[in-house]
Curated annotation (Swiss-Prot):
It comes from Mus musculus. GO terms for molecular function: transmembrane transporter activity. The gene is Mfsd14a. It is found in: Membrane. Signal peptide: none annotated. GO terms for cellular component: membrane. It is a multi-pass membrane protein. Pfam families: MFS_1 (PF07690). This is Hippocampus abundant transcript 1 protein.
Length: 490
């Protein structure tokens, strides 16, 4: 045992020496310029722009592959993906705290975009790989940790809003472009273009994105072990449960994002099937909603955070979400969908405000763990939400019986015949369920305190997060973080 320990110490000293030499010599190129929010923004934009191009083609392939149970199978596929994301997010977040953000940005983007070229090669493999890619579908987790590394606490809500707005911006034009190119040139060209954009995103990370995690925040050795407790999402949630305020935030995220995830997965089908929207109308709807979301998550979010504070901004966003879901649930006319879309854009301020609040619960070297935990909850919702919505559509006999397709032409609007009549009391039953879920989230969020006891919050969180901290992690003097969940104005 003694000889083994000596060998281990010698190996650690060798690693430390190699690391010092690399640092002294400047190491390998780490990207273009200093780490900035704009690096994260470009990564997010390219990834989701590539997937946005496939909005219309995916509907066609989904219906052709599962003609009898389109809504239900869509929910199950997204459910498996979301469950795997939930299981893997804490581990990837913790590993990024140790090994840096750049390598995991590369990993998550690569595997998230891996299914794209398979759409035309083999639809069955396409949907299978989509399900399995959930293991690495945690780009937002790493991106938010990247942003937290390079911003001060008072800057984070604006930075998170910019990232979320970029996600919305990627959906402003990409579905319309994808639908147009598919109609004129065929869906194969759309798949090739989406694949090229995904490759561009990967190359951008390799060449241009610098590492954001400061060297002093990493463990002293490269071979730092990751405990199974860090890799276990349920253990992470149990530890969070020891802190009542963090638990309230997690419950709020779960109850509010569960219907949102279901809405994302089925809303395009709903507009086409029930509201009789044409492909052009759907693309225009997505574009308008995206533009309004960008305005809400940048200008409006900044003003609200400055004027009413972090918690009240979350409550307001939840209120808008309840209104838009109820409107979609009872709405039976196209103009109601457009009006509810404007309200839905305002509700998009909720998650960046929650992310800003959550970021205050962790030290600089714990941002990946905390954001990974929240992304894990969202990943679980990404599994449960689509499956739940698909099941509710199924039991209410809402199914995609006919899709207006002429070859690869998605522009012809042929009204599908369906036995779900427009005179139903509740045209959109899953959305009404979602409104009830968000109402519960709002009631839970009311118990999140405006201000917290500084000394108690700090010591309590350090005690609970102690097992996540690596023994070699250091923090420079004078870098003490502000207490947890202190509701300061931006």
């Amino acid at each position: 045992m003694t000889q083994g320990k000596k060998k281990k110490r010698a190996a650690n000293r060798s690693i430390m020496l190699a690391k010092k030499i690399i640092i002294k010599d400047g190491g390998t190129p780490q990207g273009i310029g200093s780490p900035s929010v704009y690096h994260a923004v470009i990564v997010i934009f390219l990834e989701f722009f590539a997937w946005g191009l496939l909005t219309a083609p995916t509907l066609v392939v989904l219906h052709e592959t599962f003609p009898k149970h389109t809504f239900l199978m869509n929910g199950l596929i997204q459910g498996v993906k979301g469950l795997l994301s939930f299981l893997s997010a804490p581990l990837i977040g913790a590993l990024s705290d140790v090994w840096g953000r750049k390598s995991f940005l590369l990993l998550t983007v690569f595997f998230t975009c891996a299914p794209i070229p398979l759409m035309k090669i083999s639809p069955w493999w396409y949907f299978a790989v989509i399900s399995v890619s959930g293991v690495f579908a945690v780009t937002f987790s790493v991106v938010f940790a990247y942003v937290a590394d390079i911003t001060q606490e008072h800057e984070r809500s604006m930075a998170y809003g910019l990232v979320s707005a970029t996600f919305a911006a990627s959906l402003v034009t990409s579905p319309a472009i994808g639908a147009y190119l598919g109609r004129v040139y065929g869906d194969s060209l759309v798949v090739v273009l989406a694949t090229a954009i995904a490759l561009l995103d990967i190359c951008f990370i390799l060449v241009a994105v610098p590492e954001s995690l400061p060297e002093k925040m990493r463990p002293a050795s490269w071979g730092a072990p990751i405990s199974w407790e860090q890799a276990d999402p349920f253990a992470s949630l149990k530890k969070v449960g020891q802190d009542s305020i963090v638990l309230l935030i997690c419950i709020t995220v779960f109850l509010s994002y569960l219907p949102e995830a279901g809405q994302y997965s089925s809303f395009f089908l709903y507009l086409r099937q029930i509201m009789k929207f044409s492909p052009e109308s759907v693309a225009a709807f997505i574009a308008v909603l995206g533009i309004l979301s960008i305005i809400a998550q940048t200008i409006v979010l900044s003003l609200l955070m400055r004027s009413i504070g972090n918690k009240n901004t979350i409550l307001l966003g939840l209120g808008f979400q309840i209104l838009q879901l109820a409107w979609y649930g009872f709405g039976s006319e196209p103009w109601m969908m457009w009006a509810a879309g404007a309200v839905a854009a305002m509700s998009s301020i909720t998650f960046p405000a929650v992310s800003a609040l959550v970021s205050r619960t962790a030290d600089a070297d714990q941002q990946g763990v905390v954001q990974g935990m929240i992304t894990g909850i969202r990943g679980l919702c990404n599994g449960l939400g689509p499956a739940l919505y698909g099941f509710i559509f199924y039991i209410f006999h809402v199914e995609l019986k006919e899709l207006p397709i002429t070859g690869t032409d998605l522009g012809t609007n042929t009204s599908p015949q369906h036995h779900f009549e427009q005179n139903s009391i509740i045209p959109g039953p899953p959305f009404l369920f979602g409104a009830c879920s968000v109402l519960l989230a709002l009631l839970v969020a009311l118990f999140i305190p405006e201000h917290t006891n500084l000394s108690l919050r700090s010591s309590s969180w350090r005690k609970h997060c102690g097992s996540h901290s690596h023994p070699h992690s250091t923090q420079a003097p004078g870098e003490a973080k502000e207490p947890l969940l202190q509701d300061t104005n931006v």
